[in-house]
Amino acid sequence: MQLTTTPGIDGKRITRYCGVVAGEAVLGANIFKDLFAGIRDLVGGRSGTYEKELQRARDIALEELQQRAHDLGANAVVGIDIDYEVLGKENGMLMVSASGTAVIVE
């Protein structure tokens, strides 16, 4: 299945719009990971821990989006938008949502 942030796919023609699809992932932050990330930020390094969690959440959201598109009979999703939110008490949760339009392309 093709996934793209653009409204179409070069060289392909959209023959049917199947509907809007979305996928979400909400992950809790571990206090030890947060502490380590804070120390890394203080010394100017990148937080690999947070980057891995963001990647994992994004992958889950896109997998859900793809499955929902497949369930509608689509073979592509166009116009994908990915949003990130920090939620919960003391910002202890990370939510990634992905949405787009499921289509059939030829």
Curated annotation (Swiss-Prot):
InterPro entries: UPF0145_dom_sf, UPF0145_YbjQ-like. Gene3D superfamilies: Hypothetical protein apc22750. Chain B (3.30.110.70). It comes from the Bacteria. Coiled coil: none annotated. Belongs to the UPF0145 family. HAMAP family: UPF0145. This is UPF0145 protein Nmul_A0734. It comes from Nitrosospira multiformis (strain ATCC 25196 / NCIMB 11849 / C 71). The lineage of its organism: Bacteria, Pseudomonadati, Pseudomonadota, Betaproteobacteria, Nitrosomonadales.
